[in-house]
Regions:
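Generic alpha-helical propensity signal that fires on short helical segments
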Residues: 104-106, 111-113, 145, 171, ...
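Peripheral, non-transmembrane regulatory/ligand-interaction domains of membrane transport proteins
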Residues: 1-191, 211-214, 304-305
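Alpha-helical membrane and juxtamembrane elements of multi-pass inner-membrane transport
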Residues: 125, 159-166, 173, 199-206, ...
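Alpha-helical coiled-coil oligomerization motifs
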Residues: 154, 161, 180, 187, ...
């Protein structure tokens, strides 16, 4: 369990500060399950959801607090999406994290942020801003992967397409869903049903909401790019199949007269003079070669290939 006071900066503390002092407490789901006695949270701590139960980003408003969960598309050390639970009161912020991912984020806030009037709302704004601070770079990396896959398709290298394409579709969908849910959280903070924040502090959450919307639009563009890339791949597959069918059609067209010739002379009627003529076999061979040659010439003239 880690305590931080909110003043002109975020300051680590060894002990819990006074209830009237704005503060942040970081703990694990296991520590939360023991319902510890935390100053200023006696009546509200039980509303805090554990990180292990987090599945989506959400915010639930109550008369004396706001609580919810956050699930990020980025993965932790165990390969699972990063998740945390949170609770907000007028003077306290509770963060529940089982992956130690938020500890580095809080240290970054303590190192980089300076506030004239430190408050819970100001910390929350910077906390959520830090959550999405590097997301644009992550989306750009996804865009680069899409472009690389597109170049691969245009180069007719289609063998290793399906697996990375499926991964990209799932990843872009996860980011889009994340921003849609995070927008709902930002909306709950901006509406300030509990009256925890001043009008100027509500503007901060409005700014955060605008940024989330822009990131959601960016992720939607990536989803559309994936759909277009899938269409391009399908068009390339169709072109390849059409080329194969064209070759088969040409071969069939060229040798169809020979099939007729073989079927004709394969009947072996007694009255067929070519069967007993000593030049019958060579003549049939020559006729077959001439027929194939004429068929090839016609196909070439018609630009069938």
């Amino acid at each position: 369990m880690y305590w931080y006071t909110i003043g002109q900066t975020l300051t680590p503390q060894e002990h819990a500060p006074a209830p009237e002092q704005p503060a942040v407490v970081l703990l694990t789901s296991e520590e939360l399950s023991h319902q510890p006695e935390l100053p200023g949270l006696e009546r509200t701590l039980h509303h805090t959801p554990p990180a292990r139960d987090a599945r989506v980003c959400k915010a639930e408003v109550r008369s004396d607090c706001l609580s919810g969960t956050l699930v990020l598309p980025r993965q932790g050390k165990d390969g699972k999406p990063l998740a945390c639970g949170y609770l907000v009161t007028s003077t306290r912020v509770v963060l529940v994290d089982d992956e130690s991912a938020l500890q580095g984020l809080l240290r970054r806030i303590a190192r980089e942020k300076r506030w004239t009037n430190g408050s819970v709302s100001r910390f929350l704004y910077d906390f959520f801003e830090q959550l999405i601070a590097r997301d644009l770079h992550q989306l750009e990396k996804i865009e680069d992967r899409i472009e690389a896959l597109e170049d691969q398709v245009l180069a007719h290298e289609l063998d290793d397409f399906s697996a990375p394409m499926t991964a990209l579709r799932k990843e872009t969908m996860a980011w889009f869903r994340y921003y849609s849910q995070l927008d709902d959280v930002a909306c709950e903070l901006r509406e300030n049903e509990n009256g925890f924040f001043t009008d100027s502090e509500q503007l901060l959450f409005h700014m955060f909401e605008d940024r989330v919307i822009r990131l959601r639009e960016e992720s939607q563009l990536l989803r559309e790019s994936c759909a277009q890339l899938q269409s391009l791949f399908q068009a390339e597959i169709d072109t390849r199949q059409n080329h194969i069918m064209q070759i088969l059609t040409i071969v069939t067209t060229i040798f169809l007269p020979l099939t007729l010739l073989v079927g004709w002379y394969g009947m072996n009627f007694v009255g067929m003079p070519e069967l007993t003529w000593k030049y019958g076999y060579p003549v049939v061979v020559i006729v077959s070669i001439v027929t194939v040659g004429i068929s090839l010439w016609v196909c070439k003239k018609k630009k069938f290939w």
